[in-house]
Amino acid sequence: MIHSNKVATVVLALISSWPADGTNNHGLKLQKAQAICKMSKELKATAMRAANDAKLKITEILELENVFAAMIPNATKGTEADGCTDYNAVFLEANNTAAETVSKIATLAESATKAAGAAGRAAGVLDEFIAALAQAQGATGLYCIQGSGTGAATHTELADCFNGDLKPRNMLSIRDPKVSAAATGSTDLTTLAKAMAASGTDTTFHGDQQSKGCGLMKGTSDGIMIGQALTGTFAWAQGLLRFGALGANGIASTGVTGYAHTATASGNGVHWASDPEKIPVIAEAIALVSNYNTLADSIGTRAKDAIEKVKKCMKATNKEIKREHIFLNVSHLNRELQKAVTELDKALNKQDAKAEAKQQPNCDDKKQIECGDTPGCGWHKAEGKCEAKDGEGQKNQATGEKDANKNRCTQHGTNKEACEKENTPGQSAVCGFRKGKDGETDEPDKEKCRNGSFLTSKQFAFSVVSAAFMALLF
């Protein structure tokens, strides 16, 4: 009996000397849980970072459009002292940068949305895993995440996951100050993912305290199922942790083994993924964030740099260049003006062609009877000859007055001297001895006496268009 007591005393002494990990092996080791929480926080920060970065870049691109719109050729130019040594070079650079970056706005916004969404989804998967284990605490002191001592992990020890007690409602949101602070920096998601495999793996489960193990990580009949063992592999967080049904005593003293996240968990072991960066939800986040970073880097600070150069050249370093609607549309207005002038020119040409066709009939050399039968002709008794009736002729389209000069000029034909006598010194020329202008269909290549009102109507039309454009500018 005394001998038995001595044996019992020795056994108790040995048990009390075992390290906390062995004696209180209730589940997930603190270092592993902390690595998972850090990954989750950084994924949320990455989502915020992508959204903020895209917003900033798009704002800069639109601002570049704004300031460049004011950089018109006749604007006040900077000098070398203003940091603008070559105005034209800055103008061209700003134009090219604006065109290239504006074309990327839609793609940038789409890429940022995908990256942020994937990072947020991956963080959610890890949060669900940690939340389930953190809440698993029994009345007799059992738990699924061990703290730094012999008790369960606290929210302070899991600060990258929780802001209060270990409840899902207290997990860090994307708007949490901790996430915002992390979003101001940069991180390598692949490195953080691999850290989940390395942290707290080798000594997480060992010893012979299986009866105290976390049931959420055991596949035997006294584990995650009631009264029966699993029929296959159970996976947490898309394979971050896996365990199977074999082994009557649950977790063996051989500890945790590391296999690919897709491997089947056989035997007594609990398998941590040796390749967390390849877990589908994490791999997707890493890939889409990388895609966004590549696109964002192609834009970089180009728009911002161009803005500063433009402001210097516009002598606006210390003031905001306001958006002027007319300047934003200078090119458009020029095109529309040219189009309007072309259309007006065509219309005038058609009118002149009709006028030529409707010019007064030739009444010369007609006898009295024939003259009376010819429309537009009448017999002049005093002179005894056939002449055009008074009031015939086409109206001037610009002034609305009758153009009685057409026949007056054309009757002289190639007689230059007679043509020029029709003009009164000091007054606008009535006739001109010249070749035909654009739109004149009557022998345009031949020099002869022609009506001067053709140019008058076109000059009036151009003056109307010019006045309208100047009204827009001022």
Curated annotation (Swiss-Prot):
Localisation per UniProt entry: Cell membrane
Topology versus the membrane: Lipid-anchor; GPI-anchor
Propeptide stretch(es), residue numbers: 452-474
Region (Disordered): 388-449
SUPFAM superfamilies reported in the protein's UniProt record: Variant surface glycoprotein (N-terminal domain) (SSF58087)
Any one biological process term the GO annotation gives: symbiont-mediated evasion of host immune response
One Pfam family this sequence matches: Trypan_glycop_C
Disulfide bond residue pairs: 37-161, 144-214
Glycan attachment sites: 74, 95, 329
Function as written in the Swiss-Prot or TrEMBL entry: VSG forms a coat on the surface of the parasite. The trypanosome evades the immune response of the host by expressing a series of antigenically distinct VSGs from an estimated 1000 VSG genes.
Record-given protein name: Variant surface glycoprotein MITAT 1.5
Gene3D superfamilies found in the cross-reference section: Variant Surface Glycoprotein, subunit A domain 1
UniProt biased composition (Basic and acidic residues): 414-423, 435-449
GO cellular component: plasma membrane; side of membrane
Lipidation (GPI-anchor amidated asparagine): 451
UniProtKB keywords: Cell membrane, Disulfide bond, Glycoprotein, GPI-anchor, Lipoprotein, Membrane, Signal, Trypanosomiasis
Chief location: membrane
Residues spanning the signal sequence: 1-22
Species of the source: Trypanosoma brucei brucei
